[in-house]
């Protein structure tokens, strides 16, 4: 369907319309710019016997893992996030993990669903990006039409049960003046990662080469810009790789669950 390739038309979709399009396979890959104003979420799905430990892990690491919804065991719905929402079909890209290894990427995980699986929806930076755009701040990955670059750092998350590993951050290049404004704007959204965790000096958090992100795509950094880093909801994928649960499902980086909630609901000021 042609309208789904047009950025302006993609932005005009409601959250429900976006989910239905993903369910039909009409939207694949990055959901950046999709359903303007609607909250998007990272996804982590784990067996019930690991759910309590993962919830504790998220509570101990609220910057990279801000939980905005949890399903009941075996339930493919998270009612507080949307009507007619199906965790197993409504994401534009999934990753399947076994014993810490990503073994498959697919567009539907309905045939893998089990009665013991619990889904966690985790706040996504696309919510604060909308506020940045409204304030006139540039988003280089959007300008370039690529996924935001994401990096594994040497900053450890606080462990819980079997879950431990490094924080993942997303990066957006900004001038120093823009970075100050970005801190002010994103601080209003603590439920979707909030303010940056690091500015400049990528090597200080273990990032050796900005041109080689661990997830997403590289972007240009101009001579008058600094890299600004936010905690990222891809962190659970790094933790799953380190913790090696027997089975897990996540979203593919950049491919989010679009909800019926509005970004404005998550602003604190």
UniProtKB/Swiss-Prot annotation:
It is an enzyme of class 4 (lyase). Keywords: Lyase. Signal peptide: none annotated. Transmembrane segments: none annotated. The keyword Lyase applies. Its EC number is 4.2.1.-. InterPro entries: D-Glu_cyclase, Putative_hydro-lyase, UPF0317. One of its GO terms (molecular function) is lyase activity. NCBIfam families: PRK05463.1 (NF003969). Belongs to the D-glutamate cyclase family. This is Putative hydro-lyase M446_2125.
């Amino acid at each position: 369907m042609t309208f789904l390739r047009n950025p302006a038309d993609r932005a005009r979709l409601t959250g429900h319309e976006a989910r239905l399009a993903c369910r039909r396979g009409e939207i694949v890959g990055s959901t950046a710019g999709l359903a303007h104003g609607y909250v998007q979420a990272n996804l982590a799905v784990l067996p019930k016997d690991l759910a309590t430990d993962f919830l504790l892990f998220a509570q101990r690491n609220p910057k990279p893992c801000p939980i905005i919804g949890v399903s009941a065991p075996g339930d493919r719905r998270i009612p507080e996030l949307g009507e007619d929402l199906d965790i197993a079909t409504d994401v534009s890209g999934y990753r399947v993990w076994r014993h810490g290894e990503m073994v498959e990427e697919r567009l539907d995980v309905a045939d893998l669903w089990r009665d013991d699986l619990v889904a966690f929806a985790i706040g996504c930076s696309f919510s604060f990006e909308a506020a940045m755009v409204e304030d006139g701040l540039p988003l280089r990955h959007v300008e370039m039409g690529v996924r935001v670059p994401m990096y594994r750092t040497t900053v450890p998350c606080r462990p819980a049960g079997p879950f431990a590993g490094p924080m993942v951050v997303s990066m957006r290049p900004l001038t120093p003046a823009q970075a100050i404004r970005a801190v002010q704007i994103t601080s209003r959204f603590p439920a979707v990662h909030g303010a940056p965790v690091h500015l400049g000096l990528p090597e200080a958090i273990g990032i050796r080469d900005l041109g080689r992100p661990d997830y997403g795509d590289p972007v240009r950094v101009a001579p008058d810009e600094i890299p600004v880093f936010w905690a990222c909801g891809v962190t659970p994928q790094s933790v799953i790789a380190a913790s090696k649960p027997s089975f897990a499902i996540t979203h593919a980086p950049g491919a989010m669950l679009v909800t019926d909630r509005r970004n404005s609901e998550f602003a604190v000021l």
